[in-house]
Amino acid sequence: MAVVKVYDQNKKEAGELTLAPEVFEVEVKPEILNLVVRAHRAGLRSGTHATKTRAFVSGGGAKPWRQKGTGRARSGSNRSPIWRGGAVIFGPQPREYGFKVNKKVRQLALKMALSSRLAGENLMVVKGIELPEIKTKLFAKVAGALGLEKALVITAEADTTLALSARNIPGITLITADQLSVYEILKHPKLVMFEGAVESVQARLK
């Protein structure tokens, strides 16, 4: 059972927190993480690409010349795929790229992603971050104190002041515990969780 230090926003020790082994000490299987990340990214694709087939390209109604007697190769339409300005054969058509991943597999992958950050000593737990006003400079100062360059910060609940102060800092992404995803965890080398966010995630995944 892992016990991690809890820091305040100035990176001073503020206590300890015991992490649930069934959430933070799960064997990592890359093939499951790969499946869930692929499903996530596939779901982001719009799939609106389209090329014109012979059914959609304009023109091509009349036969260019008679079938026999001209000495030329026979042709039935000037919108054939072999003609300049003709249709596209087997081109991309609108489609849905997303595919379903079972809920249990998604939850398992989330546990694996969290476990990988703990095992790699890239998980930091903080009491919380409080800012007196919406100001990027203030959040940047806190990020500097915590040693954050490229990190995913997970808050227990939505905080407009924090969200607006952090959104312009390159490499820092701030989300709430209920928005947590495998893709976001793996995208950032460092994971910073508020103490309340840890409790929320553990309650959801146990």
From Swiss-Prot:
Keyword Metal-binding among record annotations: no
NCBIfam families: rplD_bact
Keywords: Ribonucleoprotein, Ribosomal protein, RNA-binding, rRNA-binding
PANTHER family the UniProt entry points to: 50S RIBOSOMAL PROTEIN L4, LARGE RIBOSOMAL SUBUNIT PROTEIN UL4M
Family: Belongs to the universal ribosomal protein uL4 family.
One Gene Ontology cellular component: ribosome
Assembly and interaction partners: Part of the 50S ribosomal subunit.
Keyword rRNA-binding attributed: yes
Gene Ontology BP, a term: translation
Name of this chain's protein: Large ribosomal subunit protein uL4
Location of region: Disordered: 55-80
One Pfam family here: Ribosomal_L4
Organism: Nitratidesulfovibrio vulgaris (strain DSM 19637 / Miyazaki F)
Its biological purpose: One of the primary rRNA binding proteins, this protein initially binds near the 5'-end of the 23S rRNA. It is important during the early stages of 50S assembly. It makes multiple contacts with different domains of the 23S rRNA in the assembled 50S subunit and ribosome.
Sample GO molecular function, one term: structural constituent of ribosome
HAMAP family documented for this protein: Ribosomal_uL4_B (MF_01328_B)
